[in-house]
């Protein structure tokens, strides 16, 4: 059933890990609930770092969330009473999430999504770049580089304390023990190919 409201839009919150994306999502959701709006919060089932059924920020704040394995499952949980739809860790969804949020916004819902805009390689992550392009509002947050204290826009993956290879799997859900924020200069990706076909291992840091 197509439920039409008067106006709808898409908000994207993005940035590196530890930049406060989930915290900002939680803040916006709580403001909406204070205004007596009905909010439905969703997360991918793959994200179970802190809880299977909650959005949890790195500082411990949380919201009850509905875990879904497919973007289209979101339609099963909303109704004409729903005002706001919030989706955390959106980078873990398939590209189907793009059509889903477009449809929801077109139907008049306020849609808020949060996720990583770059993977651990420093490359665009899943559907997030497209969501940024079609959104009415984009908030890009930065963390603090753990090496030098500069603004950090990248996520460093560490395996046993060593930077992960470019050829490691892109999706590996972790928390502080496996990731940390880095600036452009201190972000390390061993084996990353350069334009001339070589790896970047020989580059001076």
From Swiss-Prot:
Organism domain of life = Bacteria
Chief localization:
cytoplasm
GO-annotated biological processes: DNA biosynthetic process; thymidine metabolic process
Q: Where in the cell is it found?
A: Cytoplasm
Is rRNA-binding a UniProt keyword of this protein?
Answer: no
Q: Write out the catalytic residues in the record.
A: 89
Query: Compositional bias (Polar residues) spans?
Result: 195-205
**One GO MF term attached to the UniProt entry:** ATP binding
Name of the top EC class for this enzyme: transferase
Task: Give the EC number(s) under which this enzyme is classified.
Answer: 2.7.1.21
Which positions does UniProt annotate for ATP binding?
A: 15-22, 88-91
GO cellular component: a single term: cytosol
Q: Which family does it belong to?
A: Belongs to the thymidine kinase family.
The record's section on HAMAP family has:
Thymidine_kinase
Complex formation: Homotetramer.
The name under which this protein is listed is Thymidine kinase
